[in-house]
Design a protein with these regions (language model features):
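N-terminal Rossmann NAD(P)H-binding glycine-rich loop of SDR-like oxidoreductase domains
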Residues: 7-27
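NAD(P)H-binding glycine-rich loop region in Rossmannoid oxidoreductase-like domains
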Residues: 57-96
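C-terminal substrate-binding subdomain of Rossmann-fold SDR/epimerase-dehydratase oxidoreductases
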Residues: 207-209, 215-325
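Short, small-residue-biased leader/transition segments that mark boundaries at the very start
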Residues: 1-2, 252
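Rossmann-fold cofactor-recognition segment
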Residues: 47-59
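NAD(P)-dependent short-chain dehydrogenase/reductase
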Residues: 158-213, 219-224
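Conserved Rossmann-fold NAD(P)-dependent oxidoreductase catalytic core, especially the SDR/UDP-sugar
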Residues: 77, 102-145
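Conserved catalytic Lys-bearing alpha helix of Rossmann-like short-chain dehydrogenase/reductases
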Residues: 98-104, 138, 149-157
């Protein structure tokens, strides 16, 4: 087992972290999973359930102090500005995304920690093969700072493993769909927002064109993938970092059609966001995840059909409880 005793999740208040923290705590124990985020306000629930530290991941001195305080041996670096948000301020995106990762890797090197940091379909660009994108392929045609940061992160993670022996591991996440945390500036956000608007008002305005295929994944599969990779026998990991993982690929019309099976009056129209559309057009339609399946047994449980059933049920529960308006 990789997790020896103490886990630190940096950027715990984001879309992935807000669900990964309780997931890991349920497996390894509340006191063995420390959540850290720049915003204590948005992490109240996490802080009430287990150890929490307020941390700007660019503050290497405080970051190191937290690692030493808790005897951390596994770091999850989830700090990032997402694709569409990053295009509004590319310098800030670079400084945050690469600065947090560099600190994480250096602190891991100095304190004998393993590191997980997520990559993304955003690591691919417009000249990458669009369908069944291979594990190892061209990544020199990125058109977003988010993608540039992801490619840099993949290379840095490989470098710290090869040069310093840091146990680095990562996956290339597709768009992630969740009912727990609202999306925060990503190109695939429409695939979450559509479920909320379906429940709220029975209609949705989509900001990417019909026929725009992108890989997507339901959050429970994403959480399981993280644990499965981090628990994997290192001798089996030929790639180690940046594994393609896939679950489903669809375009907006298909998700709308699936929703109509449960809400027949649901309507959708389009108002295209040119920034998000350009980003989506540069990404793969689907990824080949055969390396993840072969090297550590990756296999998703959710497809568009059973995910839609669960999302509609869970979002309606939130609506009925007054948790969303």
């Amino acid at each position: 087992m990789l997790f020896r005793s103490k886990i630190l999740i940096v950027g715990a208040g984001g879309q992935i972290g807000s669900e990964l923290v309780p997931h890991l705590r349920s497996i390894y124990g509340n006191n063995n999973v420390v959540a850290a985020d720049i915003s204590a306000e948005k992490c109240k629930v996490l802080a009430e359930a287990g150890p929490f530290e307020e941390l700007n991941a660019l503050d290497g001195e405080k970051y190191t102090a937290i690692v030493k305080k808790y005897g951390i041996d596994t770091i999850f670096n989830l700090v990032a500005l997402l694709s569409a948000t990053g295009e509004k301020n590319p310098v800030l995106a670079w400084n945050i995304n690469i600065g947090a990762l560099t600190n994480s890797l250096n602190i891991a090197k100095d304190n004998d920690c393993a590191v997980f940091t997520p990559s993304s379909i955003g690591a691919f660009g417009k000249d990458t093969p669009k369908d069944k994108t291979p594990q190892d392929t061209l990544q020199r045609s990125n058109t977003t700072i988010y993608g540039v940061c992801k490619v840099t992160g993949e290379l840095l993670s490989d470098y710290y493993f090869n040069r310093f022996g840091v146990d680095t591991r990562s996956v290339r996440f597709p768009g992630l769909i969740s009912y727990v945390t609202l999306p925060g500036g990503g190109t695939t956000d429409y695939a979450v927002e559509i479920y909320y608007d379906a429940i709220r008002r029975g209609a949705f305005t989509c900001n990417v064109k019909a026929g725009t295929y992108m890989d997507m994944m339901y959050m429970p599969d994403a959480l399981n993938a993280v644990v499965q990779l981090m628990e994997a026998d290192p001798s089996r990991l030929k790639h180690r970092n940046s594994f393609n993982i896939a679950a489903m690929s669809f375009e907006p019309g298909q998700i709308a059609a699936e929703i109509r099976k449960h809400l027949p009056d649901f309507k959708m129209d389009y108002q295209i966001d040119p920034v998000k559309q350009a980003i989506a057009d540069s990404w793969p339609n689907s990824m080949d995840d055969s390396c993840a399946r072969e090297e550590w047994g990756w296999k998703p449980e959710y497809n568009l059909q059973n995910m839609t059933v669960d999302m509609l049920v869970k979002v309606k529960e939130k609506f009925d409880k007054g948790l969303i308006k």
